[in-house]
């Protein structure tokens, strides 16, 4: 079942928008847990794979169990990332920036995510 989205969340997840840099609640978030899709609650990213890229959006160097679909943007310049379960737009993935050993950065809009804290689910 899909969650009812706010107008701002709809702008990101459905209309493929981008929130302003450094505006999202998860940009500097550091709690242990799982980031899930705001629209369908599918697990997407672990806090173990989150890192500070100082780019203005939450950054991860891996996804959970092939939970993210990757599509080349229409202009071919960037690769869009979507929730594999509901198709919600999450952001983009970038390669070759050398932030981590995996050498990939999932650049994700905070508005496309919810967070499940490990402490609360234990």
Language model segments and positions:
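A short Gly-Trp-Pro
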Residues: 2-122
């Amino acid at each position: 079942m899909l969650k009812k989205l706010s107008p701002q969340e709809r702008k990101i997840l459905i209309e493929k928008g981008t929130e302003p840099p450094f505006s999202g609640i998860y940009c500097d978030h550091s709690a242990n847990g799982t980031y899930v899709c705001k629209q369908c609650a599918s697990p997407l990213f672990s806090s173990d794979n989150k890192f500070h890229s100082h780019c203005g959006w939450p950054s991860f160097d891996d996804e959970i169990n092939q939970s993210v679909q990757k599509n080349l943007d229409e202009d071919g310049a960037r690769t869009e990332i979507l929730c594999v379960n509901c198709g919600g737009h999450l952001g983009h993935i970038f390669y070759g920036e050398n932030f981590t050993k995996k050498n990939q950065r999932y650049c994700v809009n905070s508005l496309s995510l919810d967070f499940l804290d490990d402490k609360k689910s234990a």
